[in-house]
């Protein structure tokens, strides 16, 4: 949004700074979040788009997840009411390690491949000097995905994957399917290619 940068803090590393869930309960962002909640309520209640799902991004801890949900409730967005579902972006190692604790508060997760990869192996995906280390075949990264799918599904939580990797690699698609992923989300321009890849398995 034009002018938005005027209200952003100057951070050395914004990728792990004030982003995602940490904004939603902050006094510095509460009015903007209230507007976001009003827009969601309008879409669901007035326009009858009850299939609209709330997704909480970059949520670092279960206690933070609880706080965001409580803040949403003050703005009239209550999980389970009028079929409202709440999903979590699973893109931080803590989302995987504490999956059993997050799972009681949410209905689904979407594994964010790009952030989960860079935060698992400590690689800045925007750094040209170490970009070669950002490999989706990395064992730690694959284990994180496997752990996330297994634990969340054990707790009755739907698990999806979003990111470019399934579009670029048939092998990665097969890995996700073998791990019993529920859904794979891709950008519109990648949809046909991904469907073709899945059809080859």
Identify what each model region corresponds to.
Residues 1-201:
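Conserved alpha/beta-domain cores
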């Amino acid at each position: 949004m034009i002018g938005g940068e005027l209200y952003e803090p100057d951070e050395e590393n914004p990728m792990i700074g004030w982003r995602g869930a940490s904004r939603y309960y902050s006094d510095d962002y509460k009015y903007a979040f209230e507007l976001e909640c009003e827009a969601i309520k309008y879409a669901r209640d007035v326009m009858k788009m009850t299939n609209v799902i709330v997704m909480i991004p970059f949520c670092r801890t279960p206690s933070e997840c609880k706080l965001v949900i409580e803040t949403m409730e003050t703005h009239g967005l209550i999980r389970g009411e009028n079929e409202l579902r709440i999903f979590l972006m699973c893109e931080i190692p803590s989302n995987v390690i504490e999956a059993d604790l997050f799972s009681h508060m949410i209905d689904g997760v979407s594994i964010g491949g790009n952030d989960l990869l860079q935060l698992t192996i400590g690689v800045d995906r925007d750094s040209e000097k170490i970009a070669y280390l950002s490999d989706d075949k990395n064992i730690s990264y694959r284990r994180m995905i496997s752990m996330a799918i297994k634990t969340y599904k054990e707790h009755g939580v739907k698990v999806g994957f979003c990111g470019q990797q399934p579009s670029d690699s048939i092998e990665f698609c097969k890995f996700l399917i073998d791990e019993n992923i529920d859904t794979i989300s891709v950008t519109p321009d990648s949809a046909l290619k991904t469907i073709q890849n899945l059809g080859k398995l």
